[in-house]
Amino acid sequence: MDIREIEQERASFAFKVVSDIKDKYSQNKKVQGKYSSYAEKAPTIILNNGLGATLAFFLSKLEKPIDDVDYKSINPESFGNAENIAYAFLYKHLSTWLAEGNGKDSAFSGLTNGEDPLKYIMEKTAIDVAISTEEALSILNWIKKFAKAMLEEEL
């Protein structure tokens, strides 16, 4: 696996998820701005508090409780305000990358074998958590870049 391939996969995934936000919320600049702002701040939160605490923080920002910690079952569009929608999308995007990468046939197919990353890191060794944290920071670097370039700034 070539590092350039992995970087290309990260860039491709980040471009896709940010483009989806831009398309779905073309009339809602507040969601775009919140997503961009939270993506910008997420790496610092991870470095200060850890990946697990950051993922739990994102979930705590949702306006209604979720039945289970499972990124696949979270529907960001079901949350009412821009802040909740943005946090839900960021959790879902980060979790999807860590769990699945860009798919089974890609250069990077995830770290957690499809398991929700928050559950995964609570059960794994410090080395597994460190690897997951590095990957989270790497994908967020791309998400930040595309969000800053493509989305409206927070009002």
Curated annotation (Swiss-Prot):
Coiled coil: none annotated. Keywords: Antiviral defense, Cytoplasm. GO terms for biological process: defense response to virus. It is found in: Cytoplasm. Transmembrane segments: none annotated. The keyword Cytoplasm applies. InterPro entries: AF1862-like_dom_sf, CRISPR-assoc_prot_Cmr5. Pfam families: Cas_Cmr5 (PF09701). The keyword Cytoplasm applies. Its main location: cytoplasm. One of its GO terms (cellular component) is cytoplasm. CRISPR (clustered regularly interspaced short palindromic repeat), is an adaptive immune system that provides protection against mobile genetic elements (viruses, transposable elements and conjugative plasmids). CRISPR clusters contain sequences complementary to antecedent mobile elements and target invading nucleic acids. CRISPR clusters are transcribed and processed into CRISPR RNA (crRNA). Part of the Cmr ribonucleoprotein complex. Belongs to the CRISPR system Cmr5 family. This is CRISPR system Cmr subunit Cmr5.
